[in-house]
């Protein structure tokens, strides 16, 4: 029973770290990254579809992306989806591929993005702490119901604290890496 609670808590904490990592990928750094288009949805014959499933996205240069649709008839749909996204980029269509040049970020914009990264990291840490609180409540309930002894529950609480600290440190590491990436000119 205690092992299940610890295992479940660790899984949820890992999910929180992954979600934070995914959210940070979407923050633009001034460098071309195909993952920035993961959340961009285009209309594919009436079905909302991620453009990553409609085209190949390559990085020929540090600040340029090439998007080659699998079907040329989808070129305009993909172009419009990118223009309408909140990425702040403007694709150019040469008939064969879409070229997306990533503009250089200003110092102020870099700081704003770093603040956003910190905020996303804080959200991730809050989610991890909420999982910890839920796990602690479950452990106390088990002890109260008499399903586990006080020593077992205390050991499990210490283990849960260790796991929490480990995942909070992972979030801090991911955020620090993203901030360094953002502040790099």
From Swiss-Prot:
Membrane-crossing residue ranges in chain numbering: none
Q: Which SUPFAM superfamilies match?
A: Ribosome recycling factor, RRF (SSF55194)
CDD domains with a match to the protein in the record? RRF
Q: What is its main location?
A: cytoplasm
The record ties this protein, via Pfam families, to: RRF (PF01765)
- State if Protein biosynthesis is listed as a keyword: yes
Classify the source by domain of life.
Bacteria
Keyword entries, A-Z: Cytoplasm, Protein biosynthesis
Kindly list the places in or outside the cell where this protein is found, as annotated in its UniProt entry: Cytoplasm
UniProt GO MF annotations: ribosomal large subunit binding
Q: What Gene Ontology terms for biological process does this UniProt record contain?
A: translational termination
**GO cellular component terms, semicolon-separated:** cytoplasm
Function, as annotated, reads: Responsible for the release of ribosomes from messenger RNA at the termination of protein biosynthesis. May increase the efficiency of translation by recycling ribosomes from one round of translation to another.
Entry's family note: Belongs to the RRF family.
What's the protein here called? Ribosome-recycling factor
Provenance organism: Corynebacterium diphtheriae (strain ATCC 700971 / NCTC 13129 / Biotype gravis)
């Amino acid at each position: 029973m205690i092992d299940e609670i610890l295992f479940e808590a660790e899984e949820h904490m890992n999910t929180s770290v992954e979600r934070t990592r995914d959210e940070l990928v979407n923050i633009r750094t001034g460098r071309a990254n195909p993952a920035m288009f993961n959340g961009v949805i285009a209309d594919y014959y009436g079905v909302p579809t991620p453009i990553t499933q409609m085209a190949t996205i390559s990085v020929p240069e540090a600040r340029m992306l090439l998007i080659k649709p699998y079907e040329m008839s989808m070129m305009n749909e993909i172009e419009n989806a990118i223009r309408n996204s909140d990425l702040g980029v403007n694709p150019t269509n040469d008939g064969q591929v879409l070229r997306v040049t990533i503009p250089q970020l200003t110092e102020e914009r870099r700081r704003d993005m770093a603040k956003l990264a910190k905020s996303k990291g804080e959200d991730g840490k809050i989610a991890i702490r909420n999982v910890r609180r839920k796990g602690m409540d479950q452990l106390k309930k088990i002890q109260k119901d008499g399903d586990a002894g006080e020593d077992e529950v205390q050991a499990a609480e210490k283990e849960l604290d260790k796991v929490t600290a480990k995942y909070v440190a992972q979030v801090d590491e991911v955020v620090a890496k993203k901030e360094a990436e953002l502040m790099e000119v």
